[in-house]
């Protein structure tokens, strides 16, 4: 039987999803990050699939989302949220390590904003064993430049990309950029998926990152999957593929 528990880890609301017979065992653990304006509840079906395949799923509410929502979002909070996810990731993992519920088989998966988070986690945490990024982006600087003339700016005041604005935000964006230091993938298993017709988190930027790294030794376990005619939406086949990928790399290796 699959059990879902509400927990709070140092003021981070989470759902933990695991098979009942595994709840007190040391098993592979995956942190699942929802997308923009989503919540931990949006990932329950995915967490259940992970649990059925021998993993523990941790589903946090990200900053300004779910139980942590304080007001309506305007889009400019994106990188603050991803930066906070990076700060909180070792806290979430550490809580389970203290209880001897996870060893080195630690994974992360994210959708859209969560997929961007997954890339940032690969940059910062060598202990992350395997990762899945679904319709994410590994290059915050290029994404930020693109977003200024994209659908992200609908109903928002125009922003001029001045040198002063660039000086203010570029260091923070670079600190989250796996594209700047792709060698930090370091041979780890990474699955990347994107819908070709995605206009909200552009396919082209993500595919360009993959093309840049695919023949490098450090990326020998990076797998790319794309689905034609799919917009900003994760297909069930992509979810199935990501569950199988994490099962193979975290449970069966």
Locations of regions flagged by a protein language model:
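N-terminal cap/lid segment of alpha/beta-hydrolase-fold proteins
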Residues: 1-24
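Short beta-strand element of the alpha/beta-hydrolase
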Residues: 25-35
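The serine-hydrolase catalytic nucleophile loop
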Residues: 36-48
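Conserved alpha/beta-hydrolase
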Residues: 47-72
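Alpha/beta-hydrolase active-site loop
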Residues: 77-99
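Primarily recognizes the serine-hydrolase "nucleophile elbow" in alpha/beta-hydrolase
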Residues: 92-149
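The feature captures the conserved acid-bearing segment of alpha/beta-hydrolase catalytic domains
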Residues: 152-202
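C-terminal catalytic histidine-bearing segment of alpha/beta-hydrolase fold enzymes
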Residues: 207-210, 214-253
């Amino acid at each position: 039987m699959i059990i879902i528990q509400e927990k709070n880890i140092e003021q981070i609301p989470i759902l933990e999803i695991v098979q009942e017979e595994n709840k007190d065992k040391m098993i592979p653990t995956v942190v699942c990050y929802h997308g923009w304006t989503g919540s931990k509840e949006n990932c329950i079906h995915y967490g259940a699939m992970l649990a059925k395949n021998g993993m523990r799923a941790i589903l946090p509410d990200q900053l300004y989302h779910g139980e942590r929502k304080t007001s309506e979002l305007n889009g400019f909070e994106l990188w603050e949220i991803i930066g906070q996810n990076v700060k909180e990731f070792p806290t979430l993992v550490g809580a389970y390590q203290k209880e001897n519920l996870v060893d080195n088989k630690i994974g992360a998966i994210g959708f859209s904003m969560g997929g961007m988070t997954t890339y940032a986690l690969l940059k910062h945490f060598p202990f992350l064993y395997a990762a899945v990024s679904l319709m994410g982006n590994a290059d915050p600087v290029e994404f930020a430049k693109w977003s200024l003339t994209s659908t992200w700016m609908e109903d928002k005041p125009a922003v001029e990309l001045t040198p002063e604005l660039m000086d203010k935000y570029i260091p923070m964006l670079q600190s989250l950029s796996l594209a700047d230091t792709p060698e930090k993938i370091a041979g780890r298993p990474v699955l990347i998926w994107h819908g070709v017709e995605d206009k909200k988190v552009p396919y082209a930027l993500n595919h360009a990152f993959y093309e840049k790294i695919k023949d490098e030794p450090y990326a020998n376990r990076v797998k790319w999957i794309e689905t034609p005619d799919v917009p900003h939406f994760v297909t069930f086949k992509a979810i199935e593929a990501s569950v199988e990928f994490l099962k193979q790399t975290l449970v069966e290796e």
